[in-house]
A protein has these predicted regions:
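Active-site phosphate-binding/coordination module
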Residues: 1-54
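Hydrophobic, Leu/Ile/Phe/Ala-enriched alpha-helical segments that form helix-helix packing faces
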Residues: 37-46, 89, 93-101, 156, ...
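Conserved acidic, metal-coordinating active-site core of Asp-based
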Residues: 49-137, 145
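Terminal peptide-recognition signature
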Residues: 8, 64, 149
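Mg2+-dependent phosphoryl-transfer enzymes with acidic/Ser/Thr/Gly-rich catalytic loops
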Residues: 117-119, 123-190
């Protein structure tokens, strides 16, 4: 897929490829006091299932998950999703982290995790690579305030671009086809 795109952004824009060449990588280290705080959150969570890696280091940030990032099955993920909806566990952990570490971006991401990075290093950082004349379209599933797609959706909108809330890759594909068809019609009408 990388070779079919001009540029690919991973890890909230902290890991960037042009073709197969890595052109930018932000190597950020999780501070020890933050790691200890995450370990305590894990220790005191009342959710009973634990699997795999709970603190996943990525370029430019960390993903934290009470359930774990590897070796989890669909049923376990669904159990955590239900638990989180009932208890707002991720929201509460994020709130505590933001209070204790105001120099961190803490955002709810995906179904089971929290994304942590230095303040200002959220997904909106990718806009540094675009011109004001570029037509921007962003697709995301977590666009509410405090979620990991919010900052980019807001920044794209402020630049006159478009953002689309999607449920999954199939929904993304459907919306992409719709945009493609609309652009084709507009070019024929002109």
């Amino acid at each position: 897929m990388y070779t079919k795109c001009t540029r690919v952004y991973n890890c909230s824009g902290s890991d960037v490829y042009e073709g197969t060449k890595n052109v930018y990588r932000d190597d950020w280290e999780l501070p020890t006091d933050v790691e200890r705080h995450l370990e305590n959150e894990l220790l005191f969570s009342k959710f009973p299932i634990r699997n795999g890696i709970h603190i996943e280091r990525r370029p430019g940030g960390v993903n934290f998950s009470i359930l774990g990032r590897a070796n989890t099955c669909f049923i376990e993920r669904e159990e955590y999703v239900k638990w989180d909806k009932l208890t707002n566990e991720r929201g509460e952990i994020a709130r505590r982290l933001r209070l204790k570490f105001p120099d961190l971006e803490v955002q709810i991401g995906g179904q089971t995790g929290l994304d942590l990075a230095p303040l200002g290093r959220n997904k909106s950082q990718i806009l540094r690579d675009f011109e004001t004349s570029d037509e921007l379209h962003f697709f995301g599933d977590m666009m509410e305030e405090g979620q990991n797609d919010y900052a980019l959706a807001k920044a794209v909108e402020e630049k006159g671009g478009f953002h689309y809330h999607v449920k999954d890759w199939m929904d993304t594909r459907t919306k992409l086809v719709g945009i493609s068809d609309r652009h084709l019609v507009e070019s024929v009408v002109k």
